[in-house]
Amino acid sequence: MYLLSDDIFQVVDLNKENRGRKKWGIVVVFLLVLVVSSSSLLYWLWDREVDFEAYKTEVGETANNSLGRLTLNEVIMDDNQVLLNATFEPAKEFKPDHQVFFFPQVLVNGKDYMVRNGGQSIAKSANVYTIYNSIKMDDFPTDEILELDIRYKDWNVETRIEKPWEFQVEASQEQLQEDRHIFPIKKKVKHIDQQELMIDRVVSTPISTTIYFHSEKSIVNEALLFKIQSKGGQSWTFETPYPLNKEGTKWGSRLDGLYLSEKNYTLVPVDKDGSRLDSAIKIKKD
């Protein structure tokens, strides 16, 4: 278990449909129930002693506006995900009513692939904050070199920034593509409430593992949990699914910090108590 210090602000996570539509208090109360445990890894990811240099782009650029200085430190590329690490130094006049969260827009090769935006703030001192963001995407381009346009356009969910902090970054996903393991599946399972799902694939990188699945109709009950088990008896539970389209028919379920390096595993749909809901699926690395 990794314990986080008391100066870490709460974590919030927004999907594309929710951004800017809900009041701050409602958003925090509702979303924290869903994502605090998983998004807390944003801090842990940079704090742990693991070599992610091959997937990281050092930036070190600073932009200024009336709110203060924002320095984009690093960008990490993952499967359908971009992770950002920035430092915020507020201006003396900047006195927020709430804790500070920034939700950047990230365009990839000029297009917006974002489906979910998570953030975490850590107060390093009274005048310095570390800002972490996880931007989840769908149908990410396969180019080895990507042009990222990163725009910090609003803070605390719905407050627009008059002069956004903007950064242009060239990032490589060449090594990520080499180290990524794909487990093609294309099998149907019955999940909670007898919802029929097509499990498309599992994708694993040194940073995270994601189960991709879809249904013919919009998924009503989102309590879609899975377990992946190794031959040696290890087991990991995936319990935070998120939609990949506005129709609610395409989904992903990601577990950060898990890298599936063996050739064979078993995937099992389970309920909240961990009980199996349908037959286990044997998955094999492509």
Regions found by a protein language model. Name each.
Residues 1-8:
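N-terminal targeting leaders characterized by basic, low-complexity, disordered sequences
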Residues 8-13, 25-26, 37-286:
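Alpha-helical, hydrophobic structural elements that either
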Residues 17-32:
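N-terminal Sec-pathway targeting helices
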